[in-house]
Amino acid sequence: MQALLLVLVLFIVQIYLLPGNGISLESLAVDKRCKCVKVTNRPTGLGPIIAVDVIPPGIHCRRTEIIFALKKNRKVCVDPEAPWVQQFIKKLERQHRTRKENLMVGEDGGKSTVGPVKNTIEPTPPTIGSHICL
């Protein structure tokens, strides 16, 4: 009787773990929780920011998370609604647009006799869900 119960339990577990039954394999491989337990809304004392991670809301977390990577492998979660964070992200977007425009113009200022320089790889501006290295 116990062997039959064990076989039945194993069969049910196997059915639920098969792909296509509401469990995505991706969700099994990623952390299902928010990465930021606590956020700061103060810019003081952060130091140089090396990279920015913007993680959109999803099944793992209901809120947008912004993580700044600092020197010495420190990571700080910041409040996405804080005005200084929004200004910082806008500044990064402006810098990105400027770099993109400079790539399109070319090194000679667009005075090439061959023709306009075409950018074959179009960089995208930093958006939610992106990782930005500074």
UniProtKB/Swiss-Prot annotation:
Top-level division of the source organism's lineage: Viruses
Q: Which SUPFAM superfamilies match?
A: Interleukin 8-like chemokines
Gene Ontology MF, one? chemokine activity
The Gene Ontology biological process terms listed for this entry are: defense response; immune response
Q: State where the protein is found.
A: Secreted
The positions making up the signal sequence are 1-22
For this protein, the record's Pfam families field holds: IL8
Keywords, sorted A to Z: Evasion of host immunity by viral interleukin-like protein, Host-virus interaction, Secreted, Signal, Viral immunoevasion
GO cellular component term, pick one: extracellular region
Q: Which PANTHER family match?
A: PLATELET BASIC PROTEIN, SMALL INDUCIBLE CYTOKINE A
* Functional summary from the UniProt entry: Plays a role in the early phase of cytolytic infections presumably by recruiting host B or T-lymphocytes.
Q: Quaternary structure?
A: Homodimer.
Query: Which family does the record claim for this protein?
Result: Belongs to the intercrine alpha (chemokine CxC) family.
Q: In its UniProt entry, what is this protein called?
A: Viral interleukin-8 homolog
- Taxonomy of the source species: Viruses, Duplodnaviria, Heunggongvirae, Peploviricota, Herviviricetes
